[in-house]
């Protein structure tokens, strides 16, 4: 339900904004006998849209936004959400999207990007995903510039390391709720997840145990059972990466895993909601994006 509503919002806003953008660019005054106007042209070539697994509405927005303003798009969806992306594509076709405007192309990211980024008609990149992947794409675009007809437009939204800073006189119960929901909804697999917190010792001494107690109550299981607050992370690669951070924290002299830390990949890729307390503001889990159910408190 949320994904459908958000995608509808994207499409409605984009249509409104495209009209506003066009109107605002028109000259305010034309001398008598002269007609001045500004025409906004689509890119000369195609846009490569690469969408993520964790945000269905963004997956629909990345290819449709450039198409709305006249561009041809090659849409490479995440390998972990082919079906939902396909459903969105079918909806656009049913709504009247002409053939060839958005070209749905599931497959290997490396193979598709290698072909697309070196094609002389490559004109733009619309991307949401990891910082490292975006940097790699940008570098390959730069290397391919001599082969391209124009300078590609590059638009990307990448990861982050969002934080919570608490005041010594904060609402401690409100802080517990904010950290729990901000860190562990969707297993922390979103760029807006609260993955680190800077808390006064006085605050942590009061509410730390309460936070751990609430986390211990979190229900985990099948995503089709809506009584579960958490489910599995997206795939084995994510499972291995996240558990690696947890295991290295357990072995560190400056970190303590105070709740969670367990995992099970016997059926699905389940990782317990985990809190790491550290005395080192530069600890690995304090500075690197984990993209999983791990909160580090300093």
Residue ranges of model-derived segments:
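Glycine-rich nucleotide-phosphate-binding loops and adjacent flexible coil segments
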Residues: 293
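Conserved beta-strand/loop elements of the cytosolic catalytic core of P-type E1-E2 ATPases, chiefly
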Residues: 297-298
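Short, solvent-exposed loop/beta-turn-alpha elements that line the ligand-binding surface or hinge
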Residues: 286
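Glycine- and acidic
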Residues: 1, 71-75, 193-195
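Rossmann-like NAD(P) dinucleotide-binding subdomain of oxidoreductase/dehydrogenase enzymes
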Residues: 20-174
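Long amphipathic alpha-helix in the N-terminal Rossmann-like dinucleotide-binding domain
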Residues: 1-24, 34-35
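ALDH superfamily catalytic-core signature
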Residues: 91, 96, 118-119, 124, ...
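Short coil/turn segments at secondary-structure boundaries
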Residues: 1-3, 21-29, 191-192, 223-227
